[in-house]
Amino acid sequence: MAVIALAVVIAVAVPALFAQAGPPSSRVLPRGAEAMLGLEYAVLPGNAGTLDLFVPARGRGPYPVVLWSQGSGWTSDRGNLGGEPVAEQLARRGYAVALFSVRSSEQAVFPAQVHDAKAAVRFIRAHAEEFGLDPDRVVAAGNSSGGWIATMLGVTSGEPALEGELGVTGVSSRVHAVVNFFAPTDFLSITSQMLPGACDRFNESYGVTHCHDDLQAFESRLIGASTLRHPDLAIAASPLAYIDAGDPPTLIAHGTDDWVVPYQQSSLLFAALDAAGVPTAYYEVADVGHDFRFAASGSVLDTEVESAHLDPAPPPGQQLTWDVITDFLDRQTGGPHRPR
């Protein structure tokens, strides 16, 4: 929430590279949840602006709510699809889940995606009573670029240039906690932190030549310009630029074998939040790549846990599971809420 001067983002024509994923042939909805599909939190192009809400089928509200946008390197406007396993895990633990989509980098450049996400939060808060939700327990979560969205929601509260005027206005877009799976946090350092050989794999997989510094790589496409030639824009789109003591408690998870977003991006985020005095836990999981499914796998994984400003602190080596995640959210947002 520290205020920085936001440069004007100038769109640079970048040829289409990353095809958007088509709709799933058969979407499996979360068990144990009542679904409200196709809600519109703002009028946006394509599938952007869509929100699917899943409320626990057991118990009584108002339920705490987690907003989740599925990662895609900002190349898809279908962030409301793919988070169904997350919604199922959280719904059985007493949390409502809103899966929502923002504009892709082809539809609009930064800060449009943050404007969209804040509009989604305002929509949820404005309709909390109608949907049986607790407006004072709103959490942002996501993976990869979706984790970036969640983190930006956490660290940019009070930034007028990032609030936008989409959808419902006059309602707070503040979130009370963040869960971040392997998000990019400092665009200018990503390439230098890649694992040995990872840039070769990245270049081959995504059709680029200069790893994350390429004009057609995810980050440059997001800001509509080269991150190297326009470092001011790259910094403005990096969560690290906004961190201060008022940011919400944050749980971070990253695998050490991630060849898409290096785990040092999460190390930087943890260090910055720690320095600002923000309650934070960081789970660094050995031999795990760009994938959050380990949290539901039941496997025992070598996990290094760092924490700051948490009482009690998580124990060393604690396995990150959905029980651990919801216990963190319970502690940081006002106590347990479980189906009865």
Residue ranges and their predicted role:
Residues 22-61:
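N-terminal cap/lid segment of alpha/beta-hydrolase-fold proteins
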Residues 62-71:
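Short beta-strand element of the alpha/beta-hydrolase
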Residues 80-98:
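Short amphipathic alpha-helix adjacent to the substrate-entry channel of hydrolases
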